[in-house]
UniProtKB/Swiss-Prot annotation:
Entry binding sites for Mg(2+): E69
InterPro entries: Beta-tubulin_BS (IPR013838), Beta_tubulin (IPR002453), Tub_FtsZ_C (IPR008280), Tubulin (IPR000217), Tubulin/FtsZ-like_C (IPR037103), Tubulin/FtsZ_2-layer-sand-dom (IPR018316), Tubulin/FtsZ_GTPase_sf (IPR036525), Tubulin_C (IPR023123)
Subunit description: Dimer of alpha and beta chains. A typical microtubule is a hollow water-filled tube with an outer diameter of 25 nm and an inner diameter of 15 nM. Alpha-beta heterodimers associate head-to-tail to form protofilaments running lengthwise along the microtubule wall with the beta-tubulin subunit facing the microtubule plus end conferring a structural polarity. Microtubules usually have 13 protofilaments but different protofilament numbers can be found in some organisms and specialized cells.
MF term (GO), any: GTPase activity
Protein name: Tubulin beta-5 chain
Organism annotation: Triticum aestivum (Wheat)
Keywords of the record: Cytoplasm, Cytoskeleton, GTP-binding, Magnesium, Metal-binding, Microtubule, Nucleotide-binding
Amino acid sequence: MREILHIQGGQCGNQIGSKFWEVVCDEHGIDPTGRYVGTSDLQLERVNVYYNEASCGRFVPRAVLMDLEPGTMDSVRTGPYGQIFRPDNFVFGQSGAGNNWAKGHYTEGAELIDSVLDVVRKEAENCDCLQGFQVCHSLGGGTGSGMGTLLISKIREEYPDRMMLTFSVFPSPKVSDTVVEPYNATLSVHQLVENADECMVLDNEALYDICFRTLKLTTPSFGDLNHLISATMSGVTCCLRFPGQLNSDLRKLAVNLIPFPRLHFFMVGFAPLTSRGSQMYRSLTVPELTQQMWDSKNMMCAADPRHGRYLTASAMFRGKMSTKEVDEQMINVQNKNSSYFVEWIPNNVKSSVCDIAPRGLSMASTFIGNSTSIQEMFRRVSEQFTAMFRRKAFLHWYTGEGMDEMEFTEAESNMNDLVAEYQQYQDATADEEEELYEDEDDADLQE
């Protein structure tokens, strides 16, 4: 049944990924040794989306873990769920990519990629009907961005008709880990535009803000941020893993969210977000969830949806609720805020309802939006890129690994084209669209 193969790369990807497996194991009632300790048959019904059942009745995640240095892998292995993974699926080098995209994509990463692909192939052959791949990585470093995009393009070659979903952590506007982030991110986006089907865009600053403002955590750790991400990741695929009244899968999601093939970078949000202390005092309603999930403060990337318009959006609800109420709320949102939706795509919000809520909540919702305001992120990275590239700063680290300046120029213009496309559809009105069609019709007639 519709399996998803999970791949995590680099330090960031491995940390998010291991948090994600903690959440999914908890939802399916699987303990750190891979044994089922749950109470409900529903947990086992479609457990095989993310797990392989071994002969001894243990469940092994369909996960591939890769990195160019052993450090993060060791901490995953010694972490709470470290023993659940298949030992052969840890693939790591020794040298590290040193935040250098070229090392991850062309030199160090290229040497390791074949052994990663062998593991991916093995896992894919174990699947009954593979639905697609989900990749966790960051775009600012060297391994997740360079080697991550290399792996995505190789998988694309070998499995062209399978969905490719990525959870990509973009460099944040104010929090920077490395100076060369804009280079690494731009080179990665250049690849993701061509080779990924759906990219969920995350960034640390927006996640910090959520922890700080909404969850009232005074000193949020990466663990807290990753917990937010993993709640969203689990929400995106809950329809595949649990029975629901309105199902959605990765492909349905893509068909409903991507009006133009290049514009597949989504904002994600999750509700309810309440600070840990006040959680028990709230009873949730569908209108409350809806209000929170459409709130710009809830978005996990630093772009404000009020500065653009939604091309499409998807709302995934979990818990016991009436679908009628969900539909009413969605229509309500569109009617009240019609200026924030493009008018040339009618009914552009897809909703799905899954019956099983996450642990500790009566209902929850995951939001995925394709908004033109995401161009703010690309624009910001692009400006930083141009500032450095104009001076050819730090370029020798990349050319030294065999890269050509031409590649940088191409990546830069691809990113700028993407921004221009988002802007074009933000400004488009229904009348203009009609004019375009009429022009095309005239052209047909003249032929």
